[in-house]
Curated annotation (Swiss-Prot):
Name of the encoding gene: rnhA
Gene3D superfamilies assigned to the protein according to its UniProt record, in alphabetical order: Ribonuclease H-like superfamily/Ribonuclease H
Cofactor: Mg(2+)
Catalysed reaction equations from the record: Endonucleolytic cleavage to 5'-phosphomonoester
Annotated residues for binding of Mg(2+) 2: D12, D136
Subunit composition and interactions: Monomer.
Cellular localisation: Cytoplasm
Protein name: Ribonuclease H
Length: 157
C-alpha cells in the first residue's frame, strides 16, 4: 500500500434523545477534492451514528487508501484499536461473554477498516476543529430532515 493515496476522513454522529432520531456526517478530503456525506435515521443511538459515519466514509473509497481518520468518538476509536480484535476472536462476545452491542456495525466496520491503512486521530468534540464542526452540522441536520431511514440493526438498547 506504499503507493496508495492519503485521504483525510472526518466523522461525527448525532442523536436527539439517545435513543431517538439521529444522523451522521462525514467529510472526505483528498488533495483539492472535498466530499460530504450525511444520512438521518428515525430511531437510533449516538454511538451507532458515530459508527455509521465512519463506515459510510470508508465505503466511499473505491480502492485501498491510507486514511487519516479524525473522530471525536472514543467509542469508535477504542473499539477498533483495542476491543474489536478480541471480540472477533470471542465470536463477537465481550470478555464477560455477553453479546457485543452494535455487533452488526462492528462487523461492517471491521470489513471496511481492513480494506485500508487507517491512522486514527481523536479530537475533542465542539472544540472549534473546522471539519469536525462541519460533520456535526451535517449530522444534526440529517437527524431532523427527511428522507430518514430505519436503523435496521438498532435493537432498542
Amino acid at each position: 500500500m506504499s503507493n496508495s493515496k492519503t485521504v483525510h476522513l472526518y466523522t461525527d454522529g448525532s442523536c436527539l434523545g439517545n435513543p431517538g432520531p439521529g444522523g451522521y456526517g462525514a467529510v472526505l478530503e483528498y488533495g483539492k477534492h472535498h466530499k460530504e456525506l450525511s444520512q438521518g435515521y428515525r430511531l437510533t443511538t449516538n454511538n451507532r451514528m458515530e459508527m455509521l459515519a465512519t463506515i459510510a466514509g470508508l465505503r466511499e473509497l473505491k480502492r485501498s487508501c491510507h486514511v487519516i481518520l479524525t473522530t471525536d468518538s472514543q467509542y469508535v476509536k477504542q473499539g477498533v484499536e483495542q476491543w474489536m480484535h478480541r471480540w472477533k476472536q470471542n465470536g463477537w462476545r465481550t470478555s464477560a461473554r455477553k453479546a457485543v452491542k452494535n455487533k452488526d456495525l462492528w462487523q461492517q466496520l471491521d470489513e471496511e477498516v481492513n480494506r485500508h491503512k487507517v491512522e486514527w486521530k481523536w479530537i475533542k468534540g465542539h472544540s472549534g476543529h473546522k471539519q469536525n464542526e462541519r460533520c456535526d452540522e451535517l449530522a444534526r441536520d440529517a437527524a431532523t430532515r427527511e428522507p430518514m431511514l430505519e436503523d435496521e440493526g438498532f435493537g432498542g438498547e
